[in-house]
């Protein structure tokens, strides 16, 4: 049997279906529903007020996944809902016609009889349709689509009543005797259909598209009119069947009432019925005979209960609207009484009343957004807060430079509050529990001096106050009082610290912003706070997590020493991959550099751009720092020398180029694209640097990867001074000045190999490390090194900024082997002429120690073949012949 989808969200079934109850069709149905919801952007009215909620658990059997058999209709199908709504209007007609026919008609009379049969026809169709409508099991809340169970349920409940109320009286009346007037009684059976109206109002009361107040009022009005209509029809029926028409209530106004038109009689009966129901007018129905008196007795008792029900409902509706006002007035009265009873100052009493009035206003106008936000899921709360307040918080000086992640979290945790004019937000000397951001309005910053309040300044939109007390953990410095209606964002100190604990780098930025703000302030109070705060930082008494980079950026060697003693890693990095040694070297903080080196900081560690601390000191023109770093093993790696040379040229810093040479670098080397420092100097037009580079042996005909030579660039740019300099320059054969530790090999005429990689941090390039040849692996700085996985892997790998094991022979370019330096040592005292070949050690002390072992005496100095004394190991090249001697 073919199946079709059952919809719970008002989606039409455009397909004919097919297949069984397999998961494929179920999945298609789910996908179609999801597409429907995505297109509309919101769920239809059937999703919440009329649909089903799935049961808990991932493996529940939800009715949303049911695929109904063919010809079975879902009770949630919008077409079936429309059919039910249409029948409700027919029921309203039946509610009027049935009592009227019972009281005023003795037999069928057109056009009512025709309309009755038409209406009966629609309800007959509904009886047949009900046999094909699935129903919900009240126990399992699953949709039952078995035709047999549907038929049995309907047949055992409402079928007999629906059939009887739909059966035409013309067929039924022909079976009765003429003396039996059953037309009116039979018409009253149709009132069974009123249950549909009750169900319809129950659905409307839950539908958010309709006002609950007006739905309830409409329902009560219809109930009242129906009761009055039934009362008039029933009482008229009693009068019409009474033997003596003159002894009825109708005869009180017109003795010949039976001769009046039926409309007049109906109007008279309705008048007496409504005056009795509402107990208004000049009197109630006056029962003349015993039948009328008996009916009126029950009618009045019923009216008493119905009136109580209506009055109770209307009272609840009205009280719900006015309850807030009553509660507000009671609260205001209680607050005023409290202030007067305790002799509070008038200013405090006014603040109490103003705050309560503002809270009532925000409640009544729907502005109390915090209560609404707190009732929503976290994701929705975060999105709302981000939309409303992110732009304001992003401009606060305290959060300049922090990550977007922390800023988003801070915005989510902030609470929006309204404050009326002249209300104290913060009191001077109170505990620092919160700080505030001003969204709208204005506040006065007030200081109490010698018992007198003085306005220090005024804060406008986008300002923050209370942050000094919160971040420095000291009593609030000022009283903050609103000038006009203001909206504030409040952030709790505990929440802030918890967020900063997970973002240590951002915490340092926040503290730095605060200290800079205090430093820029001209207020003497702020200057005192700055001094106290710096002292607390040096003593390590701040709750905020501080990093070495923060201390190095401030040049605070006391704080740096305190953090190092607490176990902070001397090589920890900030978000840019810079270590505290990078920062201290760039700022020339001598004591900070000494502390870091003493605690094991790596002098050759690189940041994310490939810069080393030695280069930071060189480019910052801190010669003492550069010398200190060099003495502690800092070097310029071969793969970065060309990059540093290019930076020095761009900054037009000739001294930096000289320092590069001083610390073993070759400023004539090309980068990975074949570009040399001379190329850049010509492009920038730095004549003095061009002269210096030519003196260092730079090749003015060296082409880069695009074929441009320095000479060609000078001709292209038309720089006459440089062109003249090139023309007058006499090319001399320059013996390459190697970086110490790099062996020399004969030039084969093959040009320097060019690489497509970046000019810095090349993989597989050679660096200097105590005169030995090592391999410098390319490092990619990212968040991995700070993660748990990075920490674990760093213990098992030397690639994470640690030393790389040395190898006696390292593969060079083109598959050749590059061997370490070798020298020949000899001693005139032993009479040797040939000498002995040894590996060049890392220091002069080691060389003298080797000589002692080889020569059998204790040498004290190293000489060249010509007799010149050598006092630095870096002056010795591969293949040199050395003489060892001792002082006489």
From Swiss-Prot:
Task: Tell me which residues make up the KHA domain.
Answer: 822-888
Q: Which segments does the topology annotation call Extracellular?
A: 106-113, 177-184, 241-267, 288-291
List the ranges whose topology is Cytoplasmic. 1-84, 135-155, 206-219, 313-888
Q: What single Pfam family name could you report for this chain, choosing any that match?
A: Ion_trans
Q: Which residues lie within the membrane without crossing it?
A: 268-287
Q: Which GO terms describe its molecular function?
A: voltage-gated potassium channel activity
Q: Which residue ranges does UniProt annotate as crossing the membrane?
A: 85-105, 114-134, 156-176, 185-205, 220-240, 292-312
**Transport keyword on record:** yes
* Binding-site positions, a nucleoside 3',5'-cyclic phosphate: 398-519
Q: Which domain of life does this protein belong to? A: Eukaryota
Q: What SMART domains is this protein classified in? A: ANK, cNMP
> Which comment does the entry carry about domains?
The segment S4 is probably the voltage-sensor and is characterized by a series of positively charged amino acids. The pore-forming region H5 is enclosed by the transmembrane segments S5 and S6 in the Shaker-type (1P/6TM) and contains the GYGD signature motif which seems to be involved in potassium selectivity.
Q: Which family does it belong to?
A: Belongs to the potassium channel family. Plant (TC 1.A.1.4) subfamily.
Assembly with partners or alone: The potassium channel is probably composed of a homo- or heterotetrameric complex of pore-forming subunits.
Against PANTHER family, the record matches this protein to:
POTASSIUM CHANNEL AKT1, POTASSIUM CHANNEL AKT6
- What name does the UniProt record give this protein? Potassium channel AKT6
Q: Which organism is it from?
A: Arabidopsis thaliana
Q: Which gene encodes it?
A: AKT6
């Amino acid at each position: 049997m073919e199946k079709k989808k059952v919809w719970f969200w008002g989606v039409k079934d455009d397909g004919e279906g097919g297949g069984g109850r397999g998961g494929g069709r179920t999945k298609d149905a789910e996908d179609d529903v999801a597409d429907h919801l995505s297109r509309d952007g919101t769920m239809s009215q059937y999703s919440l007020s009329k649909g089903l909620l799935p049961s808990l658990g991932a493996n529940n059997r939800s009715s949303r996944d049911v695929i109904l058999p063919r010809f079975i209709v879902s009770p949630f199908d919008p077409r079936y809902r429309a059919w039910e709504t249409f029948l409700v209007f027919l029921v309203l007609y039946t509610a009027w016609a049935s009592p009227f026919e019972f009281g005023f008609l003795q037999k069928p009379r057109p056009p009512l009889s025709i309309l009755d049969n038409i209406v009966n026809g629609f309800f007959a169709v509904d009886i047949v349709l009900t046999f094909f409508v699935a129903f919900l099991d009240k126990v399992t809340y699953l949709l039952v689509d078995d035709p047999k169970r549907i038929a049995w349920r309907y047949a055992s409940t409402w079928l007999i009543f629906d059939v009887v109320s739909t059966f035409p009286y013309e067929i039924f009346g022909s079976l009765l005797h003429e003396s039996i007037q059953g037309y009116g009684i039979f018409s009253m059976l149709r009132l069974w259909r009123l249950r549909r109206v009750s169900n319809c109002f129950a659905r409307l009361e839950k539908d958010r598209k309709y006002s609950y107040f007006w739905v309830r009022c409409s329902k009560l009005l219809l109930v009242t009119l129906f009761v009055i209509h039934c009362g008039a029809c029933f009482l008229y029926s009693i009068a019409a069947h009474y033997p003596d028409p003159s002894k009825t209530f109708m005869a009180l106004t017109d003795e010949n009432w039976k001769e009046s038109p039926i409309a007049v009689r109906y109007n008279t009966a309705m008048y007496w019925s409504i005056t009795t129901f509402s107990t208004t007018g000049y009197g109630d129905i006056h029962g003349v005979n015993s039948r009328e008196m008996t009916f009126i007795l029950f009618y009045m008792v019923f009216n008493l209960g119905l009136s109580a029900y209506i009055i109770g409902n209307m009272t609840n509706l009205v009280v719900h609207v006015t309850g807030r006002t009553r509660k507000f007035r009671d609260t205001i009265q209680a607050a005023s009484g409290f202030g007067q009873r305790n002799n509070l100052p008038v200013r405090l009493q006014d603040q109490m009343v103003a705050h309560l009035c503002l809270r009532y206003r925000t409640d009544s106008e729907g502005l109390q957004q915090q209560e609404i936000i707190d009732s929503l899921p976290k994701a929705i709360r975060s999105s709302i807060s981000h939309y409303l307040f992110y732009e304001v918080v992003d401009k606060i000086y305290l959060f300049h430079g922090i990550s977007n992640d922390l800023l988003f979290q801070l915005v989510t945790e902030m609470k929006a509050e309204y404050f009326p004019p002249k209300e104290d937000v913060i009191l001077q000397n109170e505990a620092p529990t919160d700080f505030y951001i001003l969204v709208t309005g204005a506040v006065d910053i007030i200081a109490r001096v010698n018992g007198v309040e003085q306005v220090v300044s005024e804060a406008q939109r986008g300002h923050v106050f209370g942050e000094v007390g919160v971040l420095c953990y000291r009593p609030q410095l000022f009283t903050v009082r609103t000038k006009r209606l203001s909206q504030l964002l409040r952030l709790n100190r505990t929440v802030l610290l918890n967020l900063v604990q997970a973002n240590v780098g951002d915490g340092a930025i926040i503290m730095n912003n605060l200290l800079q703000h205090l430093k820029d302030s001209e207020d003497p109070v702020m200057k005192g706070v700055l001094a106290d705060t710096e002292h607390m930082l040096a003593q390590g008494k701040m709750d905020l997590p501080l990093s070495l980079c923060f201390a190095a950026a401030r040049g605070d060697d006391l704080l740096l020493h305190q953090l190092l003693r607490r176990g902070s890693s001397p090589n920890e990095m900030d978000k840019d991959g810079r270590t505290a040694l990078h920062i201290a070297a760039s700022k020339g903080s001598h004591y900070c550099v000494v502390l870091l080196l003493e605690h094991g900081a790596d002098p050759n560690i690189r940041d994310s751009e490939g810069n080393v601390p030695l280069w930071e000191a060189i480019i910052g023109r801190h010669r003492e720092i550069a010398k200190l770093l060099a003495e502690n093993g800092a070097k310029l790696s071969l793969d970065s020398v060309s990059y540093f040379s290019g930076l020095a040229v761009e900054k037009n810093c000739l001294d930096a180029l000289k320092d590069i040479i001083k610390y073993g670098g070759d400023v004539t080397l090309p980068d990975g694209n074949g570009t040399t420092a001379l190329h850049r100097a010509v492009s920038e037009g730095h004549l003095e640097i061009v002269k210096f580079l030519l003196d260092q042996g730079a090749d003015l005909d060296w082409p880069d990867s695009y074929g441009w030579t320095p000479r060609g660039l000078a001709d292209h740019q038309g720089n006459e001074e440089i062109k003249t300099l090139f023309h007058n320059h006499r090319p001399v054969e320059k013996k390459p000045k190697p970086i110490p530790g790099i062996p020399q090999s004969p030039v084969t005429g093959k040009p320097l190999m060019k690489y497509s990689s970046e000019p810095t941090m090349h993989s597989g390039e050679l660096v200097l490390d105590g005169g030995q040849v090592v391999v410098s692996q390319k490092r990619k700085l990212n968040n991995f090194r700070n993660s748990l996985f990075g920490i674990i892997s760093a213990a098992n790998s030397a690639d994470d900024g640690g030393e790389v094991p040395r190898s006696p022979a390292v593969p060079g370019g083109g598959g050749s082997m590059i061997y370490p330096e070798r020298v020949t040592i000899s001693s005139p005292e032993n009479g040797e002429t040939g000498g002995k070949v040894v590996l060049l050690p890392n220091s002069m002390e080691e060389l003298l120690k080797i000589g002692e072992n080889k020569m059998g005496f204790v040498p004290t100095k190293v000489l060249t073949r010509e007799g010149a004394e050598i006092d630095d190991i870096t002056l010795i090249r591969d293949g040199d012949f050395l003489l060892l001697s001792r002082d006489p």
